[in-house]
Amino acid sequence: MDYKKKVAAALAPALNEYLTDTEIYEKIEIPKESKMGDYAFPTFTLAKVLRKAPQMIASELVEKIDQDQFEKVEVAGPYINFFLDKTAFGAEVLGTVLSQKAEYGQNDDGNQGNVPIDMSSPNIAKPISMGHLRSTVIGNSLSLIMSKNGYNPIKINHLGDWGTQFGKLITAYKLWGSEEEVKADPINKLLEYYVRFHKEDQEKPELDDIARDWFKKLEDGDEEAMNLWQWFREESLKSFKQIYDKLGITFDSYKGEAFYNDKMDEIVQILEDKGLLKESQGAQVVDLEKYNLNPALIKKTDGATLYITRDLAAALYRYRTYDFNQSLYVVGAEQTNHFKQLKAVLKEMGFDWSDDVHHIPFGLITLNGKKLSTRSGRVVLLDEVLNDAVSLAKKQINDKNPDLANADTVAKEVGVGAVIFHDLKNERTNSFDFNLEDVVRFEGETGPYVQYSRARAESILRKAGDVEEFAQLNITDPKAWDTLKALQDFPNIVKRAAAQYEPSVIAKYALGLAKAFNKYYANSKILADDEEKTARLALVKSVSIVLEESLRLLGVKAPDEM
C-alpha cells in the first residue's frame, strides 16, 4: 500500500531512459499543501540531460503518463502534481488496517537478526533517579520498534555491580548495618551506610584501609565478602524491579560489570598478541591516533584494568552469545568519546562486526530549568516522580469523569504514560526540561492527549453498538482526508523510527494522527444514519487501532476509557 510506488510506476515508462526505478522513487516529494497534490515529481534534474526548461519537460511528461488510477495529474511550473483517487485510497487504507489490526505496520526488514540493547544500568545500592529515565524508556521503546521491524531485540540491564565502593559498603554494613533494616528498605539503608562511611572516614582514615581489604577479599572470592555482595545485589534488584514494574519494562539479562571479571584477561591477551598495547607513563594503552582519538587506557600503572577493558569483554561476549545483527548502547551523549574508542579498539583487534556496534546517545533532563546532579545533592527519585504523576492524573480524571469505574488503574496508565511519552516525544539527542504539571496535561503535545484521543475513538464505537462488519469503506467526505493519509503513513513511520533509532518519530506521528482525528471528529457527524456511517466508523476503529499500536511502541498503555 505504498502510494509513492504507484506514482513511480506511472512515471517509469516515460522516464526509464534517463532514470532508474529507484531514482524516480527517491525524487518523488510530498507537497506541503494539499492543493499542490498528494505527491509531486520535480523535473529540475532532467533539464541538463534533455536540454529543456523544467516547465516544458513537465508539460511533455504529463502527456505520457497513465492517469487512470489518479483523480488528476497536473503540471505546476517544473512539478508534476499527482492527486490520488481519495475514495479508493480511503477504502484501501481502512481495509488494510482493519484486516491486519495490531499487525499493521509490521515488517520483516530485520530478518529475525539479534539486537542486544544495553540500557538503564543503575548502580547497585543506589536509588534509580530521574537521570536513569532516558536510557530506560528509550531502550525499551527501541526494543519494541526493532521487534516491529522484524528484529529480535535482547534487553540487557548492564548493572553497576562491581568496584571499590563495595569494599566501603561491606565495611559500613559490618560496622553499622542490620539485616532487618536492609530487607525492609534496601536502597535507602545501603545508601545511608555508604554516606555514613564517607562522613566517618574524614576523621578515621583507617576506614579506607579496611574497605580496601574488603574489596581485595571480594576480588579474591572470599566467601563472606561474596555472600554480602550477592545479597546487596539481590536486595537492590528487588527494589529496581518494583520501579520497572511501574514502567511496564522487563529485561532479558541482568548481567552487569561483575559478570565480566573473568573475561578481561582474554581481551588484554588479544591486545598483547596483536602488538596493540603500548607503554605510556607506566600504563598500558592502545594508540588510536589514526582515528583522531586519544589513546585508550587498558591497564593502569598498578595493573588494574579499566572501564573500557570491561566493555571490550562485554562486546565480545555479546557477539559470541548473540551473533548480533547490530548491538546498541543507549547511554548519555557525555559518553560519546568512550564509545568511539570502544569501536576503534574492536576494529584494531580485527573484529569487523565493530561496524555493527552503535552508541545511541541522548541529551540531559533538567528539572524546572535546573540540571539533575548527584554531586550537588539534587537526586530526584524516579519512583517519586512516577507517584506524583499518577496522583496528578487521578485528580484530572476525577475532575473530568468522576464516575469512571477503574479510575485507579487508568490514573496509573495515564500518569506513568505521561512521563514516558514526554521523554520520547523529544528528539533523542536534545536536552529538555521536565515540568510535571505540563507533562500530565490532557491538552497539548502530551501522552494523555493521545490516550484521550484514542479513548474518544473507543467511546464512539461503544455508542455505535456492535459493528462486526464494516461492509462499506468508501468515504467521500474530504474532511476525513488528513486522517486517512496519516493512517496510510504508519508503516513508513515504523521503518523510519528503526532506521534513525528514534522513538520521537513514533511519538510525533501519534500526536499528528490524534490531532487529525480530533479535527475530523469536531467537524463531522460520525454517528449520523446515512450510507457512509459504517465507513466513518471504520475510520474511527482504524484510528483506535493505530493510536494504540503507536502508544505500545513507546511503552505507553492505551486505556479504553478516561
Swiss-Prot record:
Enzyme nomenclature, EC number: 6.1.1.19
Sorted alphabetically, which keywords does the UniProt record give?
Aminoacyl-tRNA synthetase, ATP-binding, Cytoplasm, Ligase, Nucleotide-binding, Protein biosynthesis
Subcellular localization is given as: Cytoplasm
Presence of the UniProt keyword Cytoplasm in the record: yes
- Residue intervals passing through the bilayer: none
The record's section on InterPro entries has: Arg-tRNA-ligase, Arg-tRNA-synth_N, Arg-tRNA-synth_N_sf, ArgRS_core, DALR_anticod-bd, Rossmann-like_a/b/a_fold, tRNAsynth_Ia_anticodon-bd
Please tell me which top-level EC class this enzyme sits in.
ligase
**GO terms for molecular function, please?**
arginine-tRNA ligase activity; ATP binding
Q: Name one GO cellular component term.
A: cytoplasm
One GO BP annotation of this record: arginyl-tRNA aminoacylation
Motif 'HIGH' region covers 122-132
Q: What does the sequence similarity comment in the record state about its family?
A: Belongs to the class-I aminoacyl-tRNA synthetase family.
In terms of PANTHER family, this protein maps to: ARGININE--TRNA LIGASE, CYTOPLASMIC, ARGINYL-TRNA SYNTHETASE
Q: What is this protein called?
A: Arginine--tRNA ligase
Q: Which organism is it from?
A: Pediococcus pentosaceus (strain ATCC 25745 / CCUG 21536 / LMG 10740 / 183-1w)
Q: What is the lineage of its organism?
A: Bacteria, Bacillati, Bacillota, Bacilli, Lactobacillales
Gene behind this chain? Answer: argS
